[in-house]
């Protein structure tokens, strides 16, 4: 190890193949951080409180899901095979108005956290209502989260008076700043078409004042862009630029219908973009110009979006589909190599959420968010390289998960949650939805 002390480390993972190489290696964790990484052949004696044998496994950084509406697990499969506006207006918004409560957000976010942890996601950017309940669920589950309170210009769950929406978001951020080192509060405006100019400006200002990220859905559909041009004479990105809302702490989610000028504005302002390939495919919204975004060196993360438009939270599935989608569309198999996508789901996603430099790499001094993948799986055999994981990875191969040095999944069991209880609570809520729908 690179330091001379002999205090035991908290957790030592041994004999695993490291994502950075092929020889068996080890990772030592202390105080929530990676203390040392190296080859087994060169490992000094390291006393450890707990040791995990990762023989036959891959040790890799945890995945970062840059966009989710975790509590929407309740609406998984509720209204499938519909266009976005009809899906939202006729099904999702009415269901939210009736069934979203603090209890629902807590338990359904816990279910999402379990699904994410058990599929190798260690950090999530979430955006919803009653976000204090989501933040509590993430804290209890031990997942790292950027939890953003939703802002929208009509009566919303927990904020019946739209004029109070930004104040409610400010209060949420103040309540959660510094409460749990794994939870970063943030602010989410639903979109430029559901939030007026004053709301957008005030919400961004609240985020700037608190020093937290600002999220919003941008240019998800062709209809949204046409509407924006009609109302504002500008694309959604151009409109946000005119309002002074684009900077490196603004995260534009979806970015499906971006033109060259939009991408230039995003690049110039240093704004981040999150792509959600499966959600955009399912709702037939289109596909984001990911190769062009990367060519402009725009910061990009990958998200699943909410369960209701995916319908799972498995980021490995997202990676494979994201890679295949663009190759098929461009008729170019060299577009978006597998390793580049895995970067976006780890270190790229971390940077996108303002956690860059601290997360997403197997390096001493990084936050200890790790996943142990069982390579003794038919789909991962033989394992020539990391590409195999991108094209063949799945939740079922995730064996152990560590977040901030804490073991949260061990031998495919979530240690932080009573999963049968979580499932039972969500089923109870679903029975109400079924009876009322």
Regions found by a protein language model. Name each.
Residues 76-143, 165-179, 425-435:
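Alpha-helical scaffold segments that flank or form the walls of functional sites
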Residues 16, 27, 32, 56, ...:
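Divalent metal-coordination and catalytic microenvironments
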Residues 1-25, 29-35, 40, 46, ...:
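Active-site microenvironment of metallo-dependent hydrolases
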Residues 242-249, 291-377, 392-393:
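His/Asp/Glu-enriched, well-ordered alpha-helical/loop segment
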Residues 74-107, 144-166, 222-249, 269-272, ...:
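Active-site gating loops and adjacent loop-to-helix segments of metal-dependent hydrolytic enzymes
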Residues 220-250, 255-268, 281-292, 306-317:
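Catalytic core of soluble alpha/beta enzymes
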Residues 133-256:
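Metal-coordinating catalytic core of metallo-dependent amide/deamination hydrolases
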